Amino acid sequence: MFEIPDIQLNQYGKPARIMFLAPYAPDAPDFSKKPYTGNGGYPQYHYNIYKAIQDIGYDVVSSSKPYSVQFAKGNVDYVFSLMNRFAMSRPEIFISSYCEFIQIPYLGAPPNIRAIAEDKLLTKMVFRSLELNVPEGIGLSGEKGIPAQAPFPGPYFVKKRFGAASGGIREDSICSSWKAVDSCARRLMEEGHEVLVEQYCEGIDVTVPVLGGENPVILGLSLIHISEPTRLRRIS
């Protein structure tokens, strides 16, 4: 068991003022949950986070616009950002970099660490330099093109080089041939993405949630269960 920490107070002795930023965060004036036609439940997820912070007792200002962070200095005490993907190059480091510039605390790792973590190819190279086992992989882009021959045996997993949360993953991301890799990689590159092709390997997806900084609370292992598409089962 662990104790929920007391509400953090600001320099005026009042509950800290928090700016909540997320692509589907509630916006003024009604701060209601937003509609969504894509896959996943991002509006509900972001709305739940907003309500949870508010229900704890914090003074929350919420926005779905990344440029709102420029109004943080002097108006809020902390930036709680889930603003990882939006229309700019390397968006995952924008909020943390700006918060560093205006010297205001924010959620998450420093921008240089985020830049490494969101670059799957660079992360793979870091792990390999530490002599950790990683699957074979190759980075592809429109400039480099796609090799005519497979550089390593399949089956293959094709994904965006940058980003997280399984963004862009579809059933055809699992490829049993290099011809299928070519098709999937070209689709991603036509959408403007660099690509990482890895050798597919079986495994499990385990997360260890950690809350807090100086005195973190480790919640234990969480095993992610995902329904496997027919194609994935066939090549496993």
PLM segments and residue spans:
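ATP-binding N-terminal substructure of ATP-dependent carboxylate-amine bond-forming enzymes
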Residues: 1-106, 112, 141-147
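A conserved helix-loop-beta module that forms one wall/lid of the active-site cleft
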Residues: 58, 96-171
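Residue-level detector of structured alpha->beta connecting loops
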Residues: 75, 103, 153, 192-193
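Short beta-strand segments
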Residues: 21-22, 159, 198
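A short, glycine/Asx- and small/polar-enriched loop/turn
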Residues: 73-76, 150-153, 213
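Phosphate-binding site of ATP-dependent enzymes
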Residues: 176-227, 231
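Short hydrophobic/aromatic-enriched beta-strand-loop microsegments
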Residues: 80-81, 105-107, 134, 217-220
